[in-house]
Amino acid sequence: MRVLVLGAGVVGTTSAWYLARAGHQVTVVDRQPVAGNETSFANGGQISVSHAEPWANPHVLPRVLKWLGREDAPLLWRWRADPAQLAWGLRFLGECFPGRVRRNIAAIVSMALYSRGRLQALREELGLQYDHLERGILHIYTDRDEFSAALDAARVMRQFGLDRDTVDVDKCLEIEPALSGARHLLVGGDYTRSDESGDANKFTCALAEHAKAAGVDFRYGLTVERIATSGSEIVGVLVQHSEGGPERLTADAYVVALGSYSPLLLRPIGVGLPVYPAKGYSATLTLAEASLAPTVSLTDDERKLVFSRLGNRLRIAGTAEFNGYNLELNPVRCQALIDRTRQLFPRLEIVGEPTLWCGLRPATPSNVPYIGQTRYRNLWLNTGHGTLGWTMACGSAASLAEMISGRRPEPEFPFLRC
């Protein structure tokens, strides 16, 4: 079968790989000049099954009220004259009830555990190098109320098979000695030994090269303009060349893996997709003295930040700014990343200035992505992974390839139709 994948981020590229391995003839189109050049470019770097608690949960409303008026708030909502933003926000509130949160955690943990296993197998098979570390993820807490709330979520995750262990401050420092300068700030943590970290951009570029060798055709510099339909089928995709005119591409099946831009393409053909961009920030520091920086990946739950060691670099990433498709760097939010890093690692030494970046995460109200078939028989989705695109990429892609090939996917997951 000829399959056209729209998007060459980590989700689109893994989709192309698994589809090619399933025997399909695959073409990937992307507006960028290389794979992994947008949302996958400088994210937090965590393979974090332990990050499965959805943003929508019973604790979020008090937190949002506490953060009102703060430009550096972990979650910043900028009201816009945008019906999609309002509709998304209302659905988000509906996902905050305990029963829905438990259901969403179950789905995310199931897919994330499966995906981590597929990533490990792929890394071993292909010998992929992407600054990966298998030292687990330590969630740290500097607020006792936040720590108490996190214990409830950790208990639920353990019920679904995740090894998330509660630890005291001494154990936090034993796991990651680089936190010794922040001992007076910490109140506790929890640790998932089986989690990992690595550079999503390096992984995506490396896998794209293997996919090319396996026969996948990557066509860069093509902007997807619209999808053409006839009845219950997709009959083509119109693209615009960065240097040239339009072109119509056809295939037997089509996969939309365009992240936050997916709903803009799907809305005109009647596929409503509650995905909204959540802008995340990152700062990448080149280390002057490696021994002073963490090697265990960290999640600062109070500030919604993650810290991942990537070779001789330290990546700090996180927060969520709901501001439409705006990609401007907010200097206050950028500085908040640096300030928190200095608080936690006061002895850290770096070379030069931090490299600052922001990207748009495709967030669903439930944090559960959309993977599966639409009402058009040959149109498939793999999008809406929010902060967990890197974590769930391999599992989502392998599952999608199974479904397109007419087989039942392995994970227990609510594969959705729109």
UniProtKB/Swiss-Prot annotation:
Catalytic activity: a D-alpha-amino acid + A + H2O = a 2-oxocarboxylate + AH2 + NH4(+)
InterPro entries membership: DadA, FAD-dep_OxRdtase, FAD/NAD-bd_sf
UniProt EC number: 1.4.99.-
Alphabetized GO MF terms: D-amino-acid dehydrogenase activity
GO cellular-component term (any): cytoplasm
A Pfam short name: DAO
Top class in the EC scheme: oxidoreductase
GO biological process: D-alanine catabolic process
The protein's annotated pathway: Amino-acid degradation; D-alanine degradation; NH(3) and pyruvate from D-alanine: step 1/1
Source organism, top-level taxon: Bacteria
Keywords assigned: FAD, Flavoprotein, Oxidoreductase
Cofactor section: FAD
Residues reported to bind FAD: 3-17
Family under the similarity heading: Belongs to the DadA oxidoreductase family.
Protein task: Oxidative deamination of D-amino acids.
Full protein name: D-amino acid dehydrogenase
Gene it is expressed from: dadA
